[in-house]
Amino acid sequence: MTTDLNQNPYLVRAQQLLCRVPLIDGHNDFPFIIRGLYQNNLTRASLNDLPIGQTDISRLRQGSVGGQFWSAYVPNPVHSDKESDEAYLECLRQTLQQIDVIHRMVSEHPDVFGLAQSAADVWKIFRAGRIASLIGIEGLHQIAHSPSALRMMHKLGVRYATLCHTKNNRYCDSAVDRHTSSPWSEYGGQTHDPGDEPSRNVRTGFHSLTLKYLTAVHGRIVDLSHTSEATQRDAIAISKAPVIFSHSASSSLTPSPRNVTDEILHQLKRNGGLIMVCFLRDLVNSADDANTTGSRVVDHILYIAETIGYDHVGIGSDFDGMLEGPLGLDDVSRFPELVADLFRRGVSEERIEKIVGLNTLRVMKQVEDVAVREQAEGSTGVLCDVVKPIWTAEQRQMLAEQGRTRGLRP
């Protein structure tokens, strides 16, 4: 991948295309870099040119980024019981901090960013010359077992939810967690025995309701990156709306539990969903590839496109979730070179437009439409938190007596 604009006609075409269609990246952990470097104190931060990481305003502009899903990532609790409140409430607190820092990043740089909550918002912000900023959470451990928290996160702009990260949770299994000792049947899950695979899925009970509710709450996208294959299979079967993989790649090209099998890809196509190809070296390299290059990312994009069609592939870098990206595609400034390589390989302009952003916008709009329809039909109820009693039996009796004096029964 060359960076010489004068010597690369494909790069010229790439820059022209990215002026017309927003390049929307499915996953970037820049907010976690801000947390680590500045403890979320933006008064100390210069976001224009950061000394570390793969993202800052200067490089976003160089990379012609039109839209970005910022991850409000918080790690899984360490050594905690799945049902203990304390560890998960801390995850929820930190999640709110990360959502807040994204909001402040946008509000303190209004000439650069705009908060997008719909596909229409993305177009409006992009056409105004700004970067449409969307929010995702990376694992349902971040909601602390609280549907109320999930609803409030939507009001704060969270538009996709990854079902899990690197640990199993009460909703589904992770691709990389082999620990299966907790009593899953309490929550309605089915057990099966696929060898070394995690032993739970999302098909029944609480999990199924939660999955449907994710979509029905005003159009939240279900993200299956990091989930086990069994979870992927069941989630796609359950979902009435397109799902995404926000940062994954093909397991046929690079075998990894984090990547997606051809079988799941074909299910994803039938669902109308989208896989956004990750740049993480371990997910895109080949066995004999000592130095992973950006061209390897293009290999994955083209393999997926040829397997299930150009309507179902996008870009999900995972920048700032890795120490270094592929050679030639090592930070957000290099996106145009990825597009140039697609041109060089003979991909049509129409298909590249789909890859860089139109597919993502289609999925967003379809999920929004499903949510509107589900709410209009009243087909999805309201999930409620388990709320601990706040009154004693005596207090309840006293209040009930007051009601009875008015001819009412509580």
Curated annotation (Swiss-Prot):
Its EC number is 3.4.13.19. The keyword Protease applies. Substrate binds at H165, R258, D318. It is an enzyme of class 3 (hydrolase). Residues 180-200 are annotated as: Disordered. InterPro entries: Metal_Hydrolase, Pept_M19. Pathway: Mycotoxin biosynthesis. The keyword Metal-binding applies. It catalyses: an L-aminoacyl-L-amino acid + H2O = 2 an L-alpha-amino acid. GO terms for molecular function: metal ion binding; metallodipeptidase activity. Keywords: Dipeptidase, Hydrolase, Metal-binding, Metalloprotease, Protease, Zinc. Dipeptidase; part of the gene cluster that mediates the biosynthesis of acetylaranotin, a member of the epipolythiodioxopiperazine (ETP) class of toxins characterized by a disulfide-bridged cyclic dipeptide. The first step of acetylaranotin biosynthesis is performed by the NRPS ataP which produces diketopiperazine cyclo-L-Phe-L-Phe via the condensation of 2 phenylalanines (L-Phe). The ataC domain of ataTC then catalyzes the formation of bishydroxylation of cyclo-L-Phe-L-Phe. This is Dipeptidase ataJ. It comes from Aspergillus terreus (strain NIH 2624 / FGSC A1156).
